Amino acid sequence: MSYPQFGYPYSSTPQFLMTTNSLSTCCESNGRSLSDSAAAASAQTPVYCPVYESRLLATARHELNSAAALGVYGSPYTSTQGYGNYVTYGADAPSFYSLNAFESKDGTGSAHAGIPQTAAYYPYEHTLSQYQYDRYGTMDGSTRRKNATRETTSTLKAWLQEHRKNPYPTKGEKIMLAIITKMTLTQVSTWFANARRRLKKENKMTWPPRNKCSDEKRPYDEEEEEEEDSQKATIKNEKKTVDEEIHREEKALDLSDLEDFDTIESESSECELKQPFHHQPQDGHQLRQRDCVNDHCKEVILKMPITSTATQELDRTKICHKTGLDQCEQDLLRGRQRGGGESKSCFQQQQILDSKPRIWSLAHTATSLNQTEYPSCMLKHQGLSSPSSSSSSSAVSTPVCVIDRRQDSPVTSLRNWVDGVFHDPLFRHSTLNQALTNTTVSWATTKGTLIDSGSLGRSVGNSTNVIKGQLPNLPHDTNKEFIAFQTSGSKMFCS
């Protein structure tokens, strides 16, 4: 009777029938003779005891003990007979053993050969395990190729030829190529890396070099590249626009500085009009004056400046020139018909306008060291004249145009500034101080104040030439003031 369901092919009869004597009695010394041992063995029950190693005996004892504890085996021996659960050798066991080393070695080999193999052992097969793929990623380990052959590389070469512009397969493409070529992912990746290296070495590189990145990542698609280029272009245009705006603002600031500087320097334009020092509003902001006694003389409309902006200053200059020239042309036509002195006076005024006057500058006036270089607007002939002018010629009253109002010269308001900055004795001269104090001048020049250009002379040293503005064709008027114009060279200072 056996129990194959437990994997133990034991029969119902015990394999070991031995006495409960100690194992030491089984192995006795060689001093006893074989006949003595045979006589002792005949007194007991004969036992068949094959030779086992101690390891096998210990295993057998454990298995029998566990089986008896489970109640599978009933103990065939009673306690009166002296048999326990543990198998022991009889007293005369040495009759069955020989202590010869060679015989024991032979017997041990035969004992191993007779042990049957248990049915619970199965040879390991990786296909029956839970993970049906081996570590190389294929179903059958025997079909795995250790080295790439010509057939497998032909497939990879074909794919590389189709993707010469971008020889970087994605993860999915690598898996597909690995299945087709029965290669691993590592082999496919290595092959492509070597192929790219070979093409680069042979200068057959047709793809743009990438930055340092893994082989699993593929470069951007064409659409993504176009979007990236468009974004870069947009950012570049924005930066360019901002730079242009900044440059334009800086240029505007520079131009504004230049305009301010030009406005200061060109305070007096080519026209003989200057901005009034004190603005006094009048009706129509215009002054009308007549040159002659009769009504046949023309009217000259002189626009007085109201604001001090540079743009209006330039406009006033242009209007003044244009108006003066147009009126002179009309007067020339009338003078031909009348043949009087009006054509002559208009022609003389046109000559004065053509000769560009010297720009009257406060800085030049303040820094000039010679008294004769001051313009005539600083000196008033009526009741007061410089010593040089009084010595050279006498004052003669000449009819001039009467102006509706008079403006104070800016030099009188700058007297304190001149006295505070320039401490030269020349500026402290009593005559000059008296002249600066009593100076009053009109800012509007008229056509009637005409000067013969031939009589202009340059004053040298302390001698000055006072130009007489006597007009032959105009009647003498004692109520009019005579203004002495003091010049330097052929260029007239005017205000």
Swiss-Prot record:
DNA-binding region location: 141-203
Annotated stretches, region: Disordered: 203-245
Superkingdom is Eukaryota
Q: One Pfam match, by short name?
A: Homeobox_KN
Major localization listed first in the record, in broad terms: nucleus
Which keywords has UniProt assigned to this entry? Developmental protein, Differentiation, DNA-binding, Homeobox, Neurogenesis, Nucleus, Transcription, Transcription regulation
Enumerate the CDD domains for this protein.
homeodomain
Report the Gene3D superfamilies cross-referenced here. Answer: Homeodomain-like
Alphabetically, the GO molecular function entries are: DNA-binding transcription factor activity, RNA polymerase II-specific; RNA polymerase II cis-regulatory region sequence-specific DNA binding
Spell out the subcellular localization from the entry.
Nucleus
Q: Which GO terms describe its cellular component?
A: nucleus
| GO BP field | brain development; cell development; dorsal/ventral pattern formation; heart development; neuron differentiation; proximal/distal pattern formation; regulation of transcription by RNA polymerase II
Compositional bias, Basic and acidic residues, is annotated for: 235-245
What InterPro entries does its record include? HD, Homeobox_CS, Homeodomain-like_sf, Iroquois_homeo, KN_HD
What PROSITE patterns does the record point to? HOMEOBOX_1, HOMEOBOX_2
Q: What does this protein do?
A: Acts partially redundantly with other irx members in neural patterning. Required for formation of the posterior forebrain, midbrain, hindbrain, and to a lesser extent, spinal cord. Patterns the neuroectoderm in both the anterior/posterior and dorsal/ventral axes. Does not appear to play a role in pronephros kidney development.
Family under the similarity heading = Belongs to the TALE/IRO homeobox family.
- Its name, as the record gives it, is Iroquois-class homeodomain protein irx-4-B
**Species name for this entry?**
Xenopus laevis (African clawed frog)
